[in-house]
């Protein structure tokens, strides 16, 4: 697969979503009415985007000490997320009751699941997620923040088992140039790295890290290779106990 081309295609969709919803980050057209709410769940111990219901099945293996968390039957002092589902069982809102609180509005368009994360007070769009699904399982997932960092993941399943994944850390060098220039003024030691990132860019997108993951169920291992133009390339294996599909 030409991942560079796929990333550019999806980047265009992400850019359109940012442009369309920048001034309407909690769109009324996709809000869940109280009368249409089917159930509410809570979760604790969540250290991933969207917590227990994060669309990515492999973030735990790439970022250390990242946990999906645990569902709770009711809200407690330890609850980090509140999830609201429609009557068809589709997740429609993921709420973090922090200070300030955040809400992710979630809906589906064709094979795509779109998520907009925004602050609830003086609404500001913070993160856009895009997930492409074949049946219930994702073939692609992207999380893009309002800065220039984007996280692209491509998956290959064999039935219900995840066999391999490609994860790309991508910088959009055309986004928030003023912020980048301000950072360099205060941290001139980053100039060399920024220039190396710019040299990697194709159509404004620079792949700074590429993790390839292969899951061997029989051997009980996850093989990970990191190819990075900015850091040392590495290979390693980790114990693999399988990935629950309960959240798909």
State each model region's role.
Residues 1-248:
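Buried hydrophobic residues that stabilize the cores of well-folded domains
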